[in-house]
Amino acid sequence: MDFSKCHCPKPGMCNIFNKVMTEVPPNWQWCQNATPEEREKYKQTSDAGVQTRLKKFPSGDIIQVVDLIDCAINKLTPKVLRKHKIFGIVGIPRSGLIPAAYVAEALDLPLYSLAQHKSSNTNKVILLKRSSGNNASVGKLLFLDDTSSSGRSSENLKKSFPNHIISSVFSTSKALPNLDYCGKILDGPHILSWNFFNSHHIKNTAFDLDGVFCPNVPLDVCKDDNKYTNYLANVESYHYRMPKVVKAKAVITGRLEKYRNLTEAWLKKNDVNYDKLIMFPNELRAERDKNHQQIVGRYKAENIKLLNANFFVESEMSEAKVIKRENEFVTVVCPNNGVYF
């Protein structure tokens, strides 16, 4: 490979470094005057990309709420009812209340929640909804959580409620000894749709913007700058997909840099918790518009490498494939398609 000169006549996609070289140093301008040794070293650094990961994720389907409910009703509950009489369902806050509510409704049983006394560190059961009939308190309570990972929570529940049933819809093999029942063994790694966006993974995650935090911009709006800026300022958000509790590494978007103020104001208005906003260079607009999927996909992949991000949440499958091709180390999450790879 020839490192004796810069091979790019202008800012754009560089096939030597396999990244977008803009006019901002140390990219395209830097390369004009760099020594062969500097270019070769930069190539090695660029190719190295992300070499460290928290945990290698396989490809798979994102586990959806509908999967959680189906497993609770059709796999877990029949196992329990074959051997026990149940007089109530106790949902373990917070996400354990999701399957618990559906199971209680399906069986027409009272729904309870679990509360903890902070002063005494003891647990008690609180009634949330009665059944339509007159259920006698005969049999056992079914304590239900969505997932069990280490088994510590279920172990504590067994100590507090030794005469009742402790269960989880999904459980790791490690947690099984502390459960009476589980619907399905689910060893990691995996992604759960109902908690991913505020899970510990988010600190190592970068996000696409349009199509993830809000609907994609309609084509007719893109062609009219007044409509476009109004859209950026006022588009409704997908609140359930926004990192709020844990700060995301970055938001990386194909929007042009000149719309930064509008974009930052919208992100602030919607309480998105992120560290950096990376936007597409204004001077590469024509190149972007000729082949948006490839150019923006590569630009995102390049910045994901620089951020050392483990996950990238992308709205478009076609762009996601480009990102994965350019950066094999990142796990690309596609919530609109229900998959990650």
Feature map (PLM): residue ranges:
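Conserved Lys-Pro-Asp/Glu-containing loop-to-beta segment of HAD-superfamily phosphomonoesterases
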Residues: 139-145, 294-317
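PRPP-associated nucleotide enzymes
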Residues: 30-233, 258, 265, 269
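Cysteine-centered metal-binding/redox modules
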Residues: 1-50
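Substrate-recognition element of Asp-dependent hydrolases with the DxDx(T/V) motif
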Residues: 241-264, 278-280
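Acidic, divalent-metal-coordinating active-site segment for phosphoryl/phosphodiester hydrolysis
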Residues: 148-158, 299, 304, 316-327
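Short active-site oxyanion
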Residues: 85-89, 140-141, 248-251, 308-311
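Acidic, Mg2+-coordinating phosphoryl-transfer loop and its flanking beta/alpha structural elements
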Residues: 164-173, 309-341
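Donor nucleotide-activated moiety binding/catalytic core segment of transferases
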Residues: 273-308
